[in-house]
Amino acid sequence: MGKLMNIGFGNMVNTDKIVSIIASDSAPAKRMISRGKEQETLIDATQGRRTKSVIFTENNKIILSALQPETLAGRFNGNASEGDYDTKE
């Protein structure tokens, strides 16, 4: 297991499993969210806040986050923020 990235409100995602991070306001993103709800592959990590980004994982899970895609991309690229943990020993 690699690095865990904070996606908001104490929720963590393994960065080794992330395929893409996109903004949630496009029509294709909204369709993917609807499809994820239907197929029960959606994980809502927004804590009731507005969804701002959608994270796709390699095991076909769709994760919703209340953080901006730019914020998540910065954390993904190594600009460590509070709540990011390295699990490699």
Task: Tell what function each PLM region has.
Residues 44-58:
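Short, structured protein-protein interaction patches enriched in aromatics and acidic/basic residues
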Residues 1-12:
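Short aromatic-glycine motifs in intrinsically disordered, low-complexity regions
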Residues 26, 30-39, 44:
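Compact, glycine-rich, soluble single-domain proteins
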Residues 54-89:
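C-terminal structural segments of small proteins and small subunits
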